[in-house]
Amino acid sequence: MTYQLRDIKGKVVVITGATSGIGKAAAEQLVEQGGKVVLNARNKARLDEIVAKLGADNAVAVAGDCGDPIVAREIASTALAKFGTIDTIVPNAGIGMYGSILDYSDDEVNRMMRTNYEGTVHVIRACLPTMLAKKEGDIIIVASVAGFRGGGDESIYAGTKHAQVGLAGGLDRELRSKGVRVALVCPAGTETEFAIGAGRTTGSPALAEYLRPDDVAFQIVTIMRQPLSVRSHIWTLWSMQQQS
């Protein structure tokens, strides 16, 4: 018997944090396989560039802070207006900083929680009713291995990612009987603008050992393509050079 993966042609996927790194790579891979993408990030100019590259028939963008519930609802309404449905939600937007818990400003703490956790919650809340109505869909939350065991210099960031882990566990139990699958993708260090902005440089030895955005994006697409009878919940990803 040949194992058949699902065809994702025409599937509509909402992706936050879509102008670089994992989000951008996921959008590109999905469109290559016939998917449609609804992209969100703060930088409108970069979003417009990506939509132009992917094609206006395949992509649409909503610029803004996904931690704002008004923006989250605009993402959902734009998806429905452009493509008529929502099949998958990929909350991927994330920011982080390294340092002692005492080093962060109040604003930095609040921004990490707003983007990493509240943004995840608001986008899911805005898009989920469409999937519940048709009793089918995927929520694929991009968290981090830091959500299971944060390093000594990333306590606040790790806390936001642990919040995503807890959210995913609760949603899995709430939604599996309603046809909506919930998966958690937890990569180790990945070569993204976020990693570079957190104190590393493009030539640093640490980045040479990191995952690539396409590695993580491939897992997102793989989860979508699993038969509807299969529910996979937690994926942790490491490069072969990284220490687990």
Report each predicted region and the residues it spans:
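Residue(s) in the substrate-gating loop at a strand-loop-helix junction
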Residues: 144
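Conserved glycine-rich cofactor-binding loop
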Residues: 19-20
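C-terminal helical subdomain
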Residues: 180, 184-185, 204-243
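Active-site helix of classical SDR
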Residues: 124, 160
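The beta1-alpha1 cofactor-binding region of Rossmann-like NAD(H)/NADP(H)-dependent oxidoreductases
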Residues: 44, 63-75, 106
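Substrate-binding pocket helix/loop in short-chain dehydrogenase/reductase
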Residues: 100-101, 108-110
